[in-house]
Design a protein with these regions (language model features):
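Active-site mouth loops of central-metabolism enzymes
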Residues: 5-17, 77-87, 167-178, 233-249
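Active-site beta-loop-alpha junctions enriched in small/polar residues
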Residues: 8-10, 39-41, 79-81, 109-111, ...
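Hydrophobic faces of well-ordered beta-strands that scaffold small-molecule active sites
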Residues: 3-7, 34-36, 74-77, 104-108, ...
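Catalytic domains of carbohydrate-active enzymes, especially glycoside hydrolases
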Residues: 20-37, 188, 192, 255-266
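An alpha-helical appendage that flanks or caps ligand/catalytic pockets
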Residues: 27-28, 125-166, 196-304
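Alpha-helix C-terminal capping segments
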Residues: 63-71, 97-100
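N-terminal beta1-alpha1-beta2 module of alpha/beta enzyme domains
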Residues: 1-68, 171, 271, 277-296
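Internal, glycine-rich beta/alpha segment that forms the wall or movable "lid"
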Residues: 18, 42-49, 76, 82-189, ...
């Protein structure tokens, strides 16, 4: 199992200096990738976790990190596809892939925040058809010299887009979702699945099996799939319902449980630690705490 970490995009540690510092530190320590996430806004009176109160745009933050790193992969988990045109995202993703030397991974979800749907004038439904058409437009623009698409929800007149991504097939696409139909869709259509931050260990273990079974039923090799999990770390205090909690040995043991469940990449996302990614977190203290955790959990014991 590969070990990655979250990019500083939320709260106290999401500053230009700390983003560069921790991107470089993660690369030096051997982490596989850096992952960001999307949150456009929070509605007045809307109940949201502290991590969502102040969030950098993921594509811009990853571009900033790309310019200051050389080897580490750069991913977003996830962009909510109803919020942005597939043509715009195809251009952004291809540009980031080119500028990073082919290091970009694209996670896509369908969204869940009603204020964001209203503010972007979007509708997630029908989720299945929307996702499938969206993927078709992305891949056509990335791979075809002249791309065209005429769907129920998206239309693309004959057109060309350049530059193309580094990979001939475009950046790897991972799909989110927790419903069985979404899990099966990831197994059928995507490079893999990326889990929700709110998913329990049991839900993730079950999701792995559904995704793999769907891939096999579609004639794909399930061992080729990537299963990426956002790990919310609780350093210090042990909670039985949080595998990545407790002392360093307990957190590492929890990570091993994910590996045994079939997860191929786990990223420690410290944005979810309120002392690091919370809106009121002190930047200096957040940086000290994050550096301690990232250094202590460096992936020396995990290999490809």
């Amino acid at each position: 199992m590969l070990i990655s970490c979250g990019l500083p995009v939320s709260g106290g540690w999401a500053s230009p200096a700390l983003l560069v510092r921790f991107a470089a530190l993660a690369e030096d320590l051997g982490y596989r990738g850096l992952w960001a996430f999307q949150r456009l806004l929070v509605g007045v009176g809307q109940e949201m976790a502290p991590v969502y109160q102040s969030v950098l745009d993921p594509m811009i933050a990853l571009s900033y990190a790309a310019a200051r790193t050389e080897r580490i992969r750069l991913g977003v988990a996830v962009i909510n596809l109803p919020y942005v045109s597939p043509v715009v995202l195809a251009k952004q993703a291809a540009s980031l892939d080119v500028l990073s030397g082919g290091r970009f991974d694209l996670g896509l979800g369908t969204g869940w925040s009603e204020p964001e749907f209203v503010a972007t004038g979007s509708d997630p439904n029908p989720r299945g058809r929307r996702t499938e058409e969206y993927l078709a437009v992305l891949r056509a623009l990335w791979t075809d010299q002249v791309a065209a698409f005429d769907g129920d929800l998206y239309q693309l007149p004959p057109a060309s887009m350049a530059p193309k991504p580094i990979s001939p097939s475009g950046p790897p696409i991972l799909l989110g979702g927790t419903a069985d139909v979404a899990l099966r869709r990831a197994g059928r259509l995507a490079a893999g699945w990326v889990s929700s931050s709110r998913a329990s260990f049991d839900a993730i273990a079950r999701g792995v099996q559904i995704v793999r079974r769907a891939a096999e039923e579609s004639g794909r090799d399930p061992d080729d799939l990537r299963i990426v999990v956002r790990g919310t770390v609780q350093a210090g205090e042990r909670s039985d319902d949080r595998p990545l909690s407790g002392d360093w040995a307990q957190i590492r043991a929890g990570a091993e449980r994910y590996a045994q469940a079939g997860v191929t990449e786990l990223f420690y996302d410290l944005n979810w630690d309120p002392l690091i990614g919370g809106p009121d977190a002190d930047p200096a203290r957040a940086a000290d705490r994050a550096a301690e955790i990232i250094t202590a959990l460096a992936p020396a014991d995990f290999t490809e």
